[in-house]
Amino acid sequence: MALVVICGQPCSGKSTVALCLSVALKESESSSTIRIIDEASFHLDRNQSYANMTAEKNLRGVLRSEVDRSVSRDNIIIVDSLNSIKGYRYELWCLARAAGIRYCVLFCDAEETQCKKWNEQRREKCEATYDDTICLRSQIEEVAGILLCLNYVHVKMVF
């Protein structure tokens, strides 16, 4: 039915958006199966998964394979990961197109300082956080054709 790819800086609210979207879609009259695919789905540690380029490439391969297995006209798949590489988002678009389903990119637009603040708050609560090195080297390649841009400064998210 649809493939939703959420992208943004580390700790920019992607998982919160994915969860809110999933709940809102489940509460709608849609009979579709809603599924979130993320690192936690495979019991992978986000810091190990993004520690170096090889690990990140392997993670993208695992996520892509799971998306490929999951896309269908009866499912709504939400991909909750950094999804920072334009070529990777294009690969996911190709999977959606081949399956004959819709494709949407949600970009969580949060300031870098806000992301660091949220990451630190999570660290204080002993929740899963990103290493500072991952936050420093993370850059989102150009996001063109965005259907929805979530900016936490200007938009109050209501689902």
Model-predicted regions and their roles:
Residues I6:
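Hydrophobic anchor at the beta1->P-loop junction of P-loop NTPases
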Residues S12-N75, K116:
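Conserved substrate/cofactor phosphate-moiety recognition/catalytic segment
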Residues Q9:
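P-loop (Walker A) phosphate-binding loop of NTP-binding proteins
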